[in-house]
């Protein structure tokens, strides 16, 4: 029987500022780096071995994995980076503070954008301040869109 271990990246600068992140590439905070080290220590303590390593192409995920691998003394393993594993694209919400967004649009609407399966957030427009900093033709995703992006990669490469 095979096991799949999923690890979320450590705290990022946007997490700390309570901003929607999605495809925007932000660095880990010092706390995020420590969280990744702690994940590595726990994996080591539990004596978990991996055959394959996968990560999104986002810096916060890649750096978290690299920190974990350093703790495990496995820095020379092959890492499979794939944009298909990137976090959900938050579209026009990218970079906005979550609390301010709730004040502006209301808690109910923000929950719809965040939690409904098939309703995406507002799409990222061409004049969005982060548009030129994100290398993607995707302008925003519902959870369904994200699922449909991730699952073909998962079924072909990971499963």
What do these predicted regions represent?
Residues 1-5:
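Extreme N-terminal starter segment of soluble prokaryotic enzymes
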Residues 8:
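Active-site beta-alpha turn of Rossmann-fold NAD(P)-dependent dehydrogenases/reductases
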Residues 11-67, 71, 134-151:
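Loop-to-helix element that buttresses phosphate recognition and phosphoryl-transfer chemistry
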Residues 154-159:
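Short, intrinsically disordered, charge-balanced linker/junction segments flanking boundaries
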Residues 106, 151-152:
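Disordered, low-complexity tails and leader-like regions
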Residues 102-110, 130-144:
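A short, terminal or domain-edge coil/loop segment
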Residues 17-19, 113-136:
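Short, basic/glycine-rich phosphate-binding loops at helix/coil junctions
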Residues 39-125:
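Phosphate-coordination/substrate-recognition cap region in phosphate-metabolizing enzymes
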């Amino acid at each position: 029987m095979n096991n799949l271990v999923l690890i979320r990246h450590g705290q990022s600068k946007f997490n700390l500022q309570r901003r929607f992140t999605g495809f925007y590439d932000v660095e880990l905070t010092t706390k995020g780096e420590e969280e990744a080290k702690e994940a590595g220590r726990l994996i080591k303590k539990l004596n978990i071995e991996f055959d394959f390593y996968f990560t999104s192409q986002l810096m916060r995920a890649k750096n978290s994995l690299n920190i974990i691998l350093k703790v495990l003394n496995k820095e020379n393993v092959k890492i499979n980076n794939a944009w298909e594993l990137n976090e959900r694209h938050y579209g026009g919400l990218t970079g906005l503070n979550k609390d301010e967004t709730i004040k502006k649009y209301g808690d109910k609407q923000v929950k719809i954008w965040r939690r409904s399966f098939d309703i995406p957030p507002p799409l990222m427009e061409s004049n969005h301040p982060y548009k030129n900093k994100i290398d993607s033709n995707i302008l925003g995703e519902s959870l369904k869109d994200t699922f449909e992006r991730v699952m073909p990669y998962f079924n072909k490469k990971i499963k």
